[in-house]
Amino acid sequence: MYAAVKPLSKYLQFKSVHIYDAIFTLHSKVTVALLLACTFLLSSKQYFGDPIQCFGDKDMDYVHAFCWIYGAYVSDNVTVTPLRNGAAQCRPDAVSKVVPPENRNYITYYQWVVLVLLLESFVFYMPAFLWKIWEGGRLKHLCDDFHKMAVCKDKSRTHLRVLVNYFSSDYKETHFRYFVSYVFCEILNLSISILNFLLLDVFFGGFWGRYRNALLSLYNGDYNQWNIITMAVFPKCAKCEMYKGGPSGSSNIYDYLCLLPLNILNEKIFAFLWIWFILVAMLISLKFLYRLATVLYPGMRLQLLRARARFMPKKHLQVALRNCSFGDWFVLMRVGNNISPELFRKLLEELYEAQSLIKIPPGADKI
């Protein structure tokens, strides 16, 4: 199993320069890794065998293929027999009986779970992919030399002066586009989380409404109720009906009882994903409130920089940032998150010294 998910470890390795913040990483990196791990797990026959296994006397390879392609079904009146160990026996009607077509609930999603998880992983990765293109290696260019020159103070001071010249230049429009592109990717993150929620609800036929009660029963320790609810969404066994031609040319109906072993894992995977998607959506929403506060309150931006710069004197910081736009502040914060607080304070102190030599224009004492 480790060999199957080992390639994901390289995807999650921390880079020396972080172009995403923590919540962005959770959405577009960790979530993608989780979805791909679930995909590999569900598609591995080594651990769960064939995705459908039907009981019969002969031609079982054909029966398995037929029931996999055309789908199995359960009765609307699913009976669940609780066992002593908290497990359950699913009996989608007696095998000898025929379930009327109007009472059949076909499990149409079963063949598509792996593909849907794979598609979701690509969709969740899209904002990170777009930002990586739009970012264009700017932060790496600004910060990477500090990681390479950690033991060389002279080169570090030289690069600090390069950064001071960079932030003293007029890149306001460039930095504003940089900020807008990042916020667009954050909006995309939130939109994807909400649309994914709706997609799974449609895919499983009212999944979230039923599974919320299942998770509550699990939290309360009511495993019988958990089994009853999850059996309706992820039945472990189902019936499959097939027509075969007889010797005289007439068709005979054969029905089989089939096991759906992947649903043992599906019920647990989607219980976890249900909680995970809610958590990620809530964090992204909180991040939007934070982003809005930084746009509306210049004093908050100043205090955030002070906290990162080891509480540099406020007046010095105001002088250092008097010609900075909001986009400049955003790029400065991204730089501050990628270098040590000591180096970041030195950068702001040198900016203060550079700005002190320039005559202060009227009203330019705010970011």
UniProtKB/Swiss-Prot annotation:
Source organism per UniProt: Drosophila melanogaster (Fruit fly)
GO biological process, one term: spermatogenesis
Family per similarity comment: Belongs to the pannexin family.
Subcellular location: Cell membrane; Cell junction, Gap junction
Gene: zpg
Designated name of the protein: Innexin inx4
Tissue: Expressed in nurse cells and oocyte during oogenesis. Uniform expression in imaginal wing disk and low expression in developing imaginal CNS. Expressed in embryonic pole cells and primordial germ cells.
Organismal lineage: Eukaryota, Metazoa, Ecdysozoa, Arthropoda, Hexapoda
GO cellular component, as recorded: gap junction; membrane; plasma membrane
Transmembrane regions: 22-42, 111-131, 187-207, 269-289
Molecular function (Gene Ontology), one example: gap junction channel activity
Topological domains annotated Extracellular: 43-110, 208-268
Topology, Cytoplasmic side: 1-21, 132-186, 290-367
Membrane topology summary: Multi-pass membrane protein
Main location: membrane
InterPro entries documented for this protein: Innexin
Annotated Pfam families: Innexin
Swiss-Prot/TrEMBL keywords: Cell junction, Cell membrane, Gap junction, Ion channel, Ion transport, Membrane, Transmembrane, Transmembrane helix, Transport
Function in brief: Structural component of the gap junctions in germline cells. Required for differentiation and survival of germline cysts in females and of spermatogonia in males; gap junctional communication between spermatogonia and somatic cyst cells may be required for normal differentiation and survival of spermatogonia.
